[in-house]
């Protein structure tokens, strides 16, 4: 049976890379090393959210296999990253227990199905995560009103731009940690210098522009108004002047949309990024 060892090794290597790419694709980076660094960054800040990320990723990918979705899409992590975000979000809001594990399984499956439907019609980005997470979070709150964890509120203070920009990267995956944010930036840089530069621009511009809005500075410092800009920059960023202007527009629009969600008391997740990017791409298509 020794001849099977190379085959088993190759199969295991393929599956591991698929899962790691699923982490990388959270910020649209099809790179296993980037994904590994993202996972390390999550665990550095929270082992619970790290476990949630792994569970959501695996369930998302396995669901795609069972539903017989395109193999190349599965290998490239396209059916893992939305599940990853669902797993992190559920653990962020409710911790990890039997209830939330069940919710992650349901939410990750829904995100995979939504991804398959949406990608046929438009760039889905993280929209399947947003839809699935809204459904799961609402369901948990309705069934178990006392289950939500009490999240620490930031204290007011002066602007800390370094914190705002770094946490802008971290908050893409609910990580309010400066070191995790730096790891995330380095992870993007490993795969694409262009994406890293424009993601940095997105976090910086998002944080600075939000100063014009009636907001507590402490909320800006923890990256809440930068993380959607990180994603806009990573997706749309380009050195050409027209692309740069479009990227800038999307980043500013994502801040305004997040502000609208914030004032309305709605959990925004990455919806501002998705909506702003769809609008920017629509403008680009009619020019």
Place the predicted regions along the sequence by residue:
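Long hydrophobic alpha-helical segments that form multi-pass transmembrane helix bundles
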Residues: 124-180
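N-terminal signal-anchor module of multipass membrane proteins
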Residues: 1-69, 167-175, 179-191, 207-211, ...
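Structural signature of hydrophobic alpha-helical transmembrane segments
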Residues: 43-55, 94-106, 165-177, 215-226
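Transmembrane alpha-helical segments of multi-pass membrane transport proteins and ion-pumping complexes
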Residues: 49, 53, 57-69, 87-88, ...
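Loop-to-transmembrane alpha-helix initiation sites
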Residues: 101-102, 121-128, 222-227, 264-276
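A structural feature that tracks compact, well-ordered secondary-structure segments
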Residues: 64, 68-78, 84-94, 184-187, ...
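Alpha-helical transmembrane segments of secretory-pathway, organelle, and plasma-membrane proteins
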Residues: 34-35, 185-189, 197, 202-204, ...
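Membrane-helix interface "capping/anchor" motifs
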Residues: 46-49, 66-78, 95-101, 115-125, ...
């Amino acid at each position: 049976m020794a001849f099977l060892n190379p085959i088993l090794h190759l199969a295991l290597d393929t599956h591991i890379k698929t899962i790691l790419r699923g982490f990388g694709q959270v910020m649209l980076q099809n790179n296993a090393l980037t994904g590994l660094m993202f996972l390390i960054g999550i665990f550095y800040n929270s082992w619970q959210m790290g476990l949630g990320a792994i569970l959501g990723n695996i369930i998302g990918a396995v669901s795609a296999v069972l539903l017989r979705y395109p193999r190349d899409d599965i290998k490239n992590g396209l059916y893992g990253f939305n599940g990853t975000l669902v797993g992190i979000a559920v653990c962020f809001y409710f911790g990890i227990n039997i209830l939330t594990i069940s919710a992650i399984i349901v939410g990750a499956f829904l995100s995979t199905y939504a991804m398959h439907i949406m990608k046929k019609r438009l760039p889905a980005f993280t929209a399947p995560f947003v839809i699935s997470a809204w459904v799961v979070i609402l369901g948990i709150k309705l069934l178990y009103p006392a289950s939500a964890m009490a999240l620490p509120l930031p204290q007011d203070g002066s602007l800390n731009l370094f914190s705002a920009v770094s946490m802008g990267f971290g908050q893409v995956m609910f990580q309010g940690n400066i070191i995790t944010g730096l790891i995330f930036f380095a992870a993007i840089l490993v795969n694409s210098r262009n994406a890293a530069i424009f993601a940095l621009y997105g976090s910086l511009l998002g944080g600075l522009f939000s100063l014009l809005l009636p907001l507590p500075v402490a909320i800006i410092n923890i990256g809440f108004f930068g993380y959607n800009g990180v994603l806009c920059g990573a997706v749309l960023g380009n050195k050409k002047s027209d692309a740069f202007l479009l990227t800038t527009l999307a980043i500013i629009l994502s801040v305004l949309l997040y502000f609208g969600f914030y004032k309305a008391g709605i959990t925004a997740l990455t919806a501002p990024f998705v909506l702003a990017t769809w609008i920017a791409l629509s403008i680009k298509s009619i020019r």
